[in-house]
UniProtKB/Swiss-Prot annotation:
Binds 1 [4Fe-4S] cluster. The cluster is coordinated with 3 cysteines and an exchangeable S-adenosyl-L-methionine. Residues 98-335 form the Radical SAM core domain. Keywords: 4Fe-4S, Cytoplasm, Disulfide bond, Iron, Iron-sulfur, Metal-binding, Methyltransferase, rRNA processing, S-adenosyl-L-methionine, Transferase, tRNA processing. S-adenosyl-L-methionine binds at G164, E165, S196, S219, L220, H221, N295. InterPro entries: Aldolase_TIM, Methyltransferase_A, RlmN_N, RNA_MTrfase_RlmN, rRNA_lsu_MTrfase_RlmN/Cfr, rSAM. This is Dual-specificity RNA methyltransferase RlmN. Belongs to the radical SAM superfamily. RlmN family. The keyword Kinase does not apply. Its cofactor is [4Fe-4S] cluster. Disulfide bonds join C105-C340. GO terms for molecular function: 4 iron, 4 sulfur cluster binding; metal ion binding; rRNA (adenine(2503)-C2-)-methyltransferase activity; rRNA binding; tRNA (adenine(37)-C2)-methyltransferase activity; tRNA binding.
Length: 358
């Protein structure tokens, strides 16, 4: 039984011709029903013959992730706990911006292998990669949900900043990006998609850059290799200087810059000396910085705390004084554990990690 949402347009054409004996033109019809009209049942495809629909039901399935729980924050953030076909749980978050625009934070793996010490997802360990249909199923769930909201907000931006490291699931990420960008698919411009990476896969970074299918964000969080090795032990396997050198040759569009994400941890990476080191590092690239304040887990064993307001502002002001664009990003959804670093999918609670506004 074929997961039809896991087929690219070209793969769908091949499936219809070789498996079902259909003409190629059927692919466009079926594709539009799947990705533009969001149908869940082949019988809803009214311009497809009954015979073809019967064959589709026999040989294929349309599977959307099951919404287990929906949580709504006081700030308007919405979090979905989703169950995949094999029972695995992941989360996705809708973050409200201005003028009714919504940013969706997407997961790409069940669990995460990176083990970053400040991120709840890191405690889960890695279970498996998500498929294209599972990744894009999050978008289908979001669009269906938003269509039923009275204000009809617009799903404008997608950020791969949820569970998992995108460049460790590169093949499915690339397949997903092609479908997202397709005029026949979900019709998202590359300028509305951001892929975030810890920097663990040089070949993946090269392929993503050459594709031009998304903007790049870098989960940096430390200005030196030594500190990065302490708080992001697996990400630090790629030497920071080598990573920055790779970013120097990363292809950027006109006026495009690489976004560096920097989570401020009180007493760990938030001093003036850290700010100076950070300036020396990121000034080697076309960069802008998103400063994200740590969200305490509430666990007594949590080794980290948020910096003081004074230290946050001093850090930001130093960056600006050295002509480095830096924005303090407000993490939304903390009251439902949907803020940065809180992602830990579970039926008893849990959540993803974004601090992205439109």
């Amino acid at each position: 039984m074929v997961d039809i949402l896991n087929l690219t347009f070209e793969e769908l054409e091949t499936f219809l011709v070789e498996k079902l004996g259909e003409k190629k033109f059927r692919a466009r019809q079926i594709w539009q029903w799947l990705w533009n009209k969001y149908v869940r049942d082949f019988d809803q495809m009214t311009n497809v013959s009954k015979q073809t629909r019967a064959q589709l039901k026999e040989h294929a399935r349309i599977f959307w992730p099951e919404v287990v729980t929906t949580s709504k924050s006081q700030d308007g953030t919405t979090k979905f706990l989703l169950r995949l076909a094999d029972g695995a749980l992941v989360e996705t978050v809708l973050i409200p911006g201005s003028q009714g625009r919504i940013t969706q934070c997407l997961s790409c793996q069940v669990g995460c292998a990176m083990g970053c010490t400040f991120c709840a997802t890191g405690t889960l360990g890695f279970e498996r990669n998500m498929t294209m249909s599972e990744i894009l199923g999050q978008v289908l769930v979001a669009r269906e949900y938003l269509n039923d909201v009275a204000e009809r907000p617009i799903l404008r931006n997608l950020v791969f900043m949820g569970m998992g490291e995108p460049l460790l699931n590169l093949d499915e990420i690339m397949r997903s990006l092609h479908t997202l960008n397709s005029e026949l698919g979900l019709q998202f411009s590359p300028r509305r998609i951001t892929v975030s990476t810890c920097g663990v896969n040089p070949e993946g970074l090269r392929r993503l850059g050459e594709s031009g299918l998304a903007y790049l964000a870098v989960s940096l969080h430390a200005p030196t290799q030594e500190l990065r090795r302490t708080i992001m032990p697996k990400a630090a396997r790629w030497e920071l200087n080598d990573f920055i050198e790779a970013l120097q040759s990363y292809p950027l569009k006109t006026r495009e810059r690489i976004t560096f994400e920097y989570l401020l941890l009180g007493g760990v990476n938030d001093s003036l000396e850290h700010a100076k080191q950070l300036v020396r590092l990121v000034s080697r690239t076309k960069a802008k910085l998103n400063l994200i304040v740590y969200n305490p887990s509430g666990d007594e064993a949590d080794p980290y705390a948020a910096p003081t307001e004074e230290r946050i502002l001093a850090f930001e002001q130093y960056l600006w004084s050295k002509h480095v664009t830096a924005i303090i990003r407000k993490s939304k959804g903390a009251d439902i554990k949907a803020a940065c670093g809180q992602l830990k999918a579970a039926e008893t609670g849990g959540t993803p990690c974004c601090a992205q506004n439109d």
